[in-house]
Amino acid sequence: MLSIKKDLLSALAIALEQLSPGAGDKAAFESPKVAAHGDFACTAAMQLAKPLKQNPRQTAESLRARLLLAPAFERWVEAIEIAGPGFINIRLKPAAKQETVREVLQAGAQYGTQPTDHERKMIVEFVSANPTGPLHVGHGRQAALGDAICNLHATQGLDVWREFYYNDAGVQIHTLATSTQARAKGLKPGDANWPEPAYNGDYIDDIARDFLAKKTVKSDDREFTASGDVEDMEAIRQFAVAYLRHEQDLDLKAFSVKFDNYYLESSLYSSGRVESTVQRLKDAGKTYEQDGALWLRSTDYGDDKDRVMKKSDGTFTYFVPDVAYHLAKWERGFTKAVNIQGMDHHGTIARVRAGLQAANAGIPAGYPDYVLHTMVRVVRHGEEVKISKRAGSYVTLRDLIEWTSADAVRFFLLSRKPDTEYIFDIDLALAKNNENPVYYVQYAHARICSILTAWGGDESQFGHVDLSPLASPQAQALMLLLAKYTDMLSHAAAGFAPHDVAFYLRELAACYHSYYDAERILVDDEAVKLARLALVAATAQVLHNGLAVLGVSAPRKM
């Protein structure tokens, strides 16, 4: 129905131009607040009434008269009604909705997507966890969000690049090394000589054991072999970082998340990018010295105060490598960049953007985009689960996957807006009933597959069958919802809102179950049976496509 909607919008734009030159850009359809009022709603008449100095209903009547004469409306529209102060409600003919079934079956896995344009490059940075411990459930939410946002924008034709940025040096990494060294020397948390601060989880003992055994670990396309020398802090640091990066990769693999590149913060220093970025800002006249420190004039770009770039002791503040890193993203050709980060990073947004603006590199003011998320609470039997033995102080992503499933974790973590606190209910994730959203959606897909298997015919004929038997209210509602998939993807991508996809899939599953309860599929009448089979096959395809965007499987059997 996508082509039909375009034809109708084109006719609406022409009619609006006839009413008021320049008004064609107001051509748009909305979903009626009450489904019984129609399939599309249009508010353009109310927008035009004031400049035309007319009563909105009078403008709506004039617009309706023009639409009734448009060939596209004559062919595909059953009724045009005016309601309230000037709403125009449009009801489509059954044949218009039936076209959706053909479009879905013809496009298959590509339904709702745009061809990839390699000139539109987008980079999404997410997870970006420092290698100091296992990934926690907050990282899991970030992994699910980042991967789904990448998938969403890929459906819109963008060439998407997934990147993981982490720090392999600094205070946290030093703490990791001293903790591992202490374990390798036989110490444990609570002992007199146990270092403070330290990481106390059992995973530190695992690293120390493998270090002493001189094992080899591979991460980020590099191999590290442990020396076994408990006095060699640099060897311990390198091995511990590689070990935990490998462990994080195993977690991400279990979650079906793959990255195109891993970017080391230390490379920004070794390559001279940090120094060159600072020099660039100096040359642009955007810095000044005060109290022995170097400051950025970030208030010139909307920040609430100027920021220290280089402290009096000669070290850089943490946002300087961030500016250098994002400048590198732009120079690598990524004209669109998105960062998925925890809510605690909110304070860095203005200063990073200010630094990029001050660099005079032609970077847009809103670069990069940010999606900030809250943390996740985990409950079981109504009580919060706070501690993992392996991590020592938090529930890990691997725990959650092992307790439930990767599909459940993905769908659950994507079912709410990122900035909304999420409570992950383990009991609900394990439930095999309609209260479990991922089970409900996957079951709809599996139910359709079982019907198609029971039928056992050639599905390739669905694209040519007579769809006129699909006239019941339930069939019409299902086809209209299938037709909304493309626009839903577009809006979800624009708003970085994979939760919209999860909501749509639940709505589609509910609509399918209602249809299934209302009409038997495998009836004796061959024409009716084939039409209904075509509809449910199209529904299965859209369920499959939407689940794929979320990174969730679509099982054929359950």
UniProtKB/Swiss-Prot annotation:
The keyword Cytoplasm applies. One of its GO terms (biological process) is arginyl-tRNA aminoacylation. Its EC number is 6.1.1.19. A motif ('HIGH' region) lies at residues 129-139. It comes from the Bacteria. It is an enzyme of class 6 (ligase). It holds the Pfam family Arg_tRNA_synt_N. One of its GO terms (molecular function) is arginine-tRNA ligase activity. GO terms for cellular component: cytoplasm. Keywords: Aminoacyl-tRNA synthetase, ATP-binding, Cytoplasm, Ligase, Nucleotide-binding, Protein biosynthesis. Its main location: cytoplasm. Signal peptide: none annotated. It catalyses: tRNA(Arg) + L-arginine + ATP = L-arginyl-tRNA(Arg) + AMP + diphosphate. InterPro entries: aa-tRNA-synth_I_CS, Arg-tRNA-ligase, Arg-tRNA-synth_N, Arg-tRNA-synth_N_sf, ArgRS_core, DALR_anticod-bd, Rossmann-like_a/b/a_fold, tRNAsynth_Ia_anticodon-bd. The keyword ATP-binding applies. CDD domains: Anticodon_Ia_Arg (cd07956), ArgRS_core (cd00671). It is found in: Cytoplasm. HAMAP family: Arg_tRNA_synth (MF_00123). Belongs to the class-I aminoacyl-tRNA synthetase family. Monomer. This is Arginine--tRNA ligase.
